Swiss-Prot record:
Signal peptide: none annotated. It is an enzyme of class 7 (translocase). Its EC number is 7.4.2.8. ATP binds at Q85, G103, E104, G105, K106, T107, D510. This is Protein translocase subunit SecA.
C-alpha cells in the first residue's frame, strides 16, 4: 500500500465517503416522508417529473427520490432500504458496477435507480440472466412501482408482438439479456416501423453483470435462416475421425511425432499434422469424396476441410455431459459458466451438426446469418449502463477497459463471518473424492447442510454415485434436473441436507438456513393460518440447529478457470452475517492443473506426496493456483478483447446499415434518395464506357448501348445521336442519357401515382438492402475465419481485416445502389385497363382449355384470339402451336404440364 493510499484511502473508500454524505441527507428526510399521506407520497412522482422538465437534474432530485422509494417500500413491501442499499442505488445511477455480496438485497436496491431514471420517461431495462428471475423480480417490485405511478413490463421469450410492445412501452421493463439483444436484431429486420418493439435504449441495469458482460461476451447473438443441407457429408466424415490418433506435442525441427492431430485445449482448437492430412486425404479419395491428386487445403476443397475440422473438434474437444447433453433426440448446449442448459442455441461453423452426427441424432440444416451482434456491442448502445453482482472486483479492469464502467465494492450491512479454509490438494481424483465424502459425513453427523459445487454434469453424476455407494442421501442440481431447481434450492438449507450442484447452484436465489418455509407453504393447497404457523415454528427450530452446526458448508470439488466463479460458489454461504464455511478440494488431475500448469510443476508437486491418499496444504499451493487462474483470466480477457476489436469493424458497418434501414422505415417518401442514387448509378455506368476527359476515339458507345439495354431496359440510339449532332460532347451526352432515364421514370410514376411509386421504391430498397447485407455478413464470416493466414505473409491480420472489410462494404453499397436502380428502371408498370384486359383474356383462355380438357396454366397470359377446335379425337404434335392460344409450341406450354402429370 502506497503512502498516498494510507493517507487518503483507496479510490473505493473515497467514493464511499462521498456517498455516505448523501445517505445522511436522505436519512434526515425520513421523518418528513413518514408524515406524508399515501396520496401525497404518490404525488411526488409527478412533482419530480415537472421539476426535471423545469431544468433540474437527476442528481439534484436524487435524495428526495430515494427517500420517496424507501418510504413507499416500507408501506407496500414491508421492507426498508438499508444505508448500504442506498449507497448501492447511488452507484447504479452512474456508469458504475456495484459489487454487493450475496443476500445483501440487490433486487430491492435496484428499485432506487430504476425509479429515479424512469422519471425521464425514456424507459428503463432491468436485465437478468433468465426468464425466471425476470418474472420474479418484476412481480416482487411491481406493487412498489405501481404505487408510485410507474408501469412495469416483463419481456421474456414466447410473448406475442402486442405483449412485447406493451412490455417495452412500460416505464420499467424486466427482461432477459438474450431477448433484449434478439429484439434489437428483429427491429432491424422489420419491414415497417409498426413492427418494431424497442424505443430509445436509455438505461440498462444489468443484474449478474459479470455473467452477461464477461462470461457471455464471446457469444454472438445471431438470427439466421436455413442454408443448404449437407447432413450426408457430416455422417460420412464422422466415420473417419475415430481412426485418427492424437499426438501429444506439435511437430518441431527436433521432434517429429507420429500422431494425426494435436489439440490446443486453451482455445479449443484441433490441428491436423502432415501425417494426419495424408491419412484424411487417402480416406476421402477412397470414399470418392475427393479426386486423386487433389489436396484437402486446395480452394476447391474448402467445404471438405470445414467438415473434417468440425468433426475432429466434435470428437476430441466437446464432451457429452460436460459441454452438452442429449435430450429428446437433440443436442442441448450446457453453459460452461452457469451449468445451465441453453435450449435453442446452436454452435456455428458446422460444429453443432458434427456433434449431432457424433451422437447419432437427427442432423439439422446449417444456418446462414441474417443479423448478428455481440453482447459487448449491444450493451454499449445504451446511453447509460450500470450493473450489479456479488463478484465484480476481480474483473474491474475489464469492465473499465471495455465498457468504461467503474467497479465500486459496497460494504455489507453486517460483518461477514464465513470461515474460508485453505485449499487441500490430492495426488489423484479418487483420493480427492474420498476426502470429500469424509467431510460430507462429518457435516451430516453434525446436522450441518452442505452444498457441493462441481464444474460439469459429468462430475456431479460421478460424485452422486460415490455418495450413493457411501449411503449418503443427497439432491443433484445440474442441467439435467434444472426444472427442480427452485425446490432443490429451497431444501438445501435444511439440517444435514446434502446438495450437489454445477455452477448453476441457485444463482439469483438465496439458500436460507433451516430451509425455506415459504416454499413449503406454496406446495400446500390453500394453507390455513395454523399450517403456516406450524411451518414457521419448524423453520425456527431447524434454523437454530443449522446456526449451531456452523451454517452452510461449501465444498468445491475443483477450482474453476475463473476466481470469480469460485467466489460465487463461496458466496452462497455466509449471507447477511450468517455463519458458514468453505473449502476447495483439488487434485493434480483437475482440468485447471492439467491445462495451465506445465509438466515440470506437476511432477514437482507429485513428488511432494509421499503417502498414498495424503493431502497437501500449503501457501505454495495457493500461489500455484492463483498463478494458474491469473493465466487463464488473462488468456480469456485477451480473447474477448480480440473478438471486440474484430467485431467493432462489423459494428461500424452494422450502425450504418441499421441507420439506413431506420431512415427507410420512418420515411414514406424516399424519392429524393432514389433520384440521387439514380444520378450516381448512371454516371458510374457512363464513366466505364466514356471515361471523363477522354477522346471520342476512346469511347465504347456500342458497349454502353448494350449495357443500358440489358441492365436498365433502355434502348438508346447513342451512335445515331453522335452522327447527327457534331456538337454533342461528353458532358452533354451524359446529361441527355440521365435526363431520358429520369423522364421515363417520371412517366412510370405518373401512370401508377406518386404514393404507389413511393411505396414500391421503399419496398425495393428494403428488400435489396436486407439481401445484400445478409450476403455481406456471410462474406465477412469467411474473411474472419481465414484472415489469420495473412500473418504468415508478415501482415497484421487485424489491419488486413479492416482494409478488406471496408473494401467489401464499399462494394456492397455500390451494388445496393445499382440493384435498386436496375429493378426500378426495368419494372414494367401496367395500367388498370391493361390488367382488366389481361384478366379477360385469361378467362377466355381458361374457357377454351376446359373445352379441350387441357390443364390450366394460371401463370400464362394471352391477348390472342383463336378459333376453338375440338382436339379430343387427335393427338397434338409436340411442335404444333398450343391450343390455348399463347403462341408457344405445345411442348413448351401445356404439353410440358401434361407430360409431368
Amino acid at each position: 500500500m502506497s503512502i498516498l493510499t494510507r493517507i487518503f484511502g483507496s479510490r473505493n473508500e473515497r467514493v464511499l465517503r462521498k456517498l455516505k454524505k448523501q445517505v445522511v441527507k436522505i436519512n434526515k428526510m425520513e421523518p418528513a416522508f413518514e408524515a406524508l399521506s399515501d396520496d401525497e407520497l404518490k404525488a411526488k412522482t409527478q412533482e419530480f417529473r415537472d421539476r426535471l422538465s423545469g431544468g433540474e437534474t437527476l442528481q439534484q432530485i436524487l435524495p428526495e427520490a430515494f427517500a420517496t422509494v424507501r418510504e413507499a417500500s416500507k408501506r407496500v413491501l414491508g421492507m426498508r432500504h438499508f444505508d448500504v442499499q442506498l449507497i448501492g442505488g447511488m452507484v447504479l445511477t452512474n456508469r458504475c458496477i456495484a459489487e454487493m455480496r450475496t443476500g445483501e438485497g440487490k433486487t430491492l436496491t435496484a428499485t432506487l435507480p430504476c425509479y429515479l431514471i424512469a422519471l425521464e420517461g425514456k424507459g428503463v431495462h432491468v436485465v437478468t440472466v433468465n426468464d425466471y428471475l425476470a418474472r420474479r423480480d418484476a412481480e416482487t417490485n411491481r406493487p412498489l412501482f405501481e404505487f408510485l405511478g410507474m408501469s412495469v413490463g416483463v419481456n421474456i421469450p414466447g410473448l406475442s408482438p402486442e405483449e412485447k410492445r406493451e412490455a417495452y412501452a412500460a416505464d420499467i421493463t424486466y427482461a432477459t439479456n438474450s431477448e433484449l439483444g434478439f429484439d434489437y436484431l428483429r427491429d432491424n429486420l422489420a419491414h415497417s416501423k409498426e413492427e418494431r418493439f424497442q424505443r430509445t435504449l436509455g438505461y440498462a441495469l444489468v443484474d449478474e453483470v459479470d455473467s452477461i458482460l464477461i462470461d457471455e461476451a464471446r457469444t454472438p447473438l445471431i438470427i439466421s435462416g436455413q442454408a443448404e443441407k449437407s447432413s450426408e457429408l457430416y455422417i460420412a466424415v464422422n466415420k473417419l475421425i475415430p481412426s485418427l490418433i492424437k499426438q501429444e506435442k506439435e511437430d518441431t525441427e527436433e521432434y517429429q511425432g507420429e500422431g494425426d492431430f494435436t489439440l490446443d485445449l486453451k482455445s479449443k482448437q484441433a490441428h491436423l499434422t502432415e501425417r494426419g492430412q495424408e491419412k484424411v486425404e487417402d480416406w476421402l479419395i477412397a470414399q470418392g469424396l475427393m479426386p486423386e491428386g487433389d489436396s484437402l487445403y486446395s480452394p476447391s476443397r474448402i467445404v471438405l476441410l470445414h467438415h473434417v475440422m468440425a468433426a475432429l473438434r466434435a470428437h476430441t474437444l466437446f464432451e457429452k455431459d460436460v459441454d452438452y447433453i442429449v435430450k429428446d433426440g437433440e443436442i442441448v448446449i450446457v453453459d460452461e459458466h452457469t451449468g445451465r442448459t441453453m435450449a435453442g442455441r446452436r454452435w456455428s461453423d458446422g460444429l453443432h451438426q458434427a456433434i449431432e452426427a457424433k451422437e447419432g441424432v437427427d442432423i439439422k440444416s446449417e444456418n446462414q446469418t441474417v443479423a448478428s451482434i455481440s453482447y459487448q456491442n449491444y450493451f454499449r448502445l445504451y446511453e447509460r449502463l450500470a450493473g450489479m453482482t456479488g463478484t465484480a472486483d476481480t474483473e474491474a479492469f475489464e469492465f473499465q477497459q471495455i465498457y468504461g464502467l467503474e467497479t465500486v465494492v459496497i460494504p455489507t450491512n453486517r460483518p461477514m463471518i464465513r470461515d474460508d479454509r485453505t485449499d487441500v490438494m490430492f495426488e489423484n481424483e479418487q483420493y480427492k473424492f474420498n476426502a470429500i465424502i469424509e467431510d460430507i459425513k462429518d457435516c451430516v453427523e453434525r446436522q450441518q447442510p452442505v452444498l457441493v459445487g462441481t464444474i460439469s454434469v459429468e462430475k456431479s453424476e460421478e460424485l452422486s454415485k460415490a455418495l450413493d455407494k457411501a449411503g449418503i442421501k443427497h439432491n443433484v442440481l445440474n442441467a439435467k434436473f434444472h426444472q427442480q431447481e427452485a425446490e432443490i434450492v429451497a431444501e438445501a438449507g435444511f439440517p444435514s441436507a446434502v446438495t450437489i450442484a454445477t455452477n448453476m447452484a441457485g444463482r439469483g436465489t438465496d439458500i436460507i438456513l433451516g430451509g425455506n418455509w415459504k416454499a413449503q407453504a406454496a406446495k400446500l393447497e390453500n394453507p390455513t393460518q395454523e399450517q403456516i404457523e406450524a411451518l414457521k415454528a419448524e423453520w425456527e427450530k431447524n434454523h437454530e440447529i443449522v446456526m449451531k452446526a456452523g451454517g452452510l458448508h461449501i465444498i468445491g470439488t475443483e477450482r474453476h478457470e475463473s476466481r470469480r466463479i469460485d467466489n460465487q460458489l463461496r458466496g452462497r454461504s455466509g449471507r447477511q452475517g450468517d455463519p458458514g464455511s468453505s473449502r476447495f478440494y483439488l487434485s493434480l488431475e483437475d482440468g485447471l492443473m492439467r491445462i495451465y500448469l506445465n509438466e515440470g510443476k506437476r511432477n514437482l508437486m507429485r513428488k511432494a506426496f509421499t503417502v498414498a491418499g495424503e493431502a497437501m496444504e500449503s501457501k505454495m499451493l495457493a500461489k500455484v493456483i492463483a498463478s494458474a487462474q491469473a493465466k487463464v483470466e488473462a488468456f480469456h480477457f485477451d480473447g474477448r478483447k480480440n473478438l471486440l476489436e474484430y467485431d467493432d469493424v462489423a459494428n461500424d458497418q452494422r450502425h450504418a446499415i441499421y441507420e439506413q434501414r431506420n431512415y427507410l422505415l420512418d420515411n414514406d417518401d424516399i424519392s429524393e434518395t432514389i433520384n440521387a442514387i439514380r444520378h450516381d448509378v448512371f454516371n458510374g455506368v457512363i464513366d466505364q464506357y466514356i471515361p471523363p476527359q477522354s477522346l471520342e476515339e476512346q469511347w465504347d458507345i456500342k458497349g454502353l448501348e448494350e449495357r443500358l439495354s440489358q441492365e436498365f431496359g433502355m434502348e438508346l440510339p447513342i451512335s445515331n445521336w453522335l452522327e447527327e449532332d457534331n456538337n454533342l460532347h461528353e458532358e452533354s451526352l451524359r446529361e441527355r442519357i440521365v435526363e431520358i432515364a429520369e423522364k421515363e421514370y417520371k412517366e412510370k410514376e405518373a401512370l401508377v401515382g406518386e404514393d404507389a411509386m413511393h411505396h414500391f421504391e421503399k419496398g425495393v430498397m428494403l428488400q435489396t438492402l436486407d439481401e445484400l447485407w445478409k450476403e455481406h455478413l456471410a462474406s465477412m464470416d469467411y474473411l474472419r475465419q481465414g484472415i489469420h493466414l495473412r500473418g504468415y505473409a508478415q501482415k497484421d491480420p487485424k489491419q488486413e481485416y479492416k482494409k478488406e472489410s471496408f473494401r467489401m462494404f464499399t462494394e456492397m453499397l455500390d451494388s445496393l445502389k445499382h440493384h435498386v436502380i436496375m429493378t426500378l428502371t426495368r419494372v414494367r408498370v401496367r395500367t388498370q385497363e391493361e390488367m382488366e384486359e389481361a384478366e379477360l383474356a385469361r378467362q377466355e383462355m381458361a374457357t377454351r382449355i376446359n373445352q379441350n380438357n387441357l390443364p390450366v396454366d394460371e401463370n400464362s397470359q394471352t391477348t390472342q384470339n383463336s378459333e376453338t377446335e375440338d382436339y379430343s379425337d387427335r393427338r397434338i404434335g409436340r411442335n404444333e402451336p398450343c391450343p390455348c392460344g399463347s403462341g408457344k409450341k405445345y411442348k413448351h406450354c401445356h404439353g410440358s404440364r401434361v407430360a409431368r402429370q
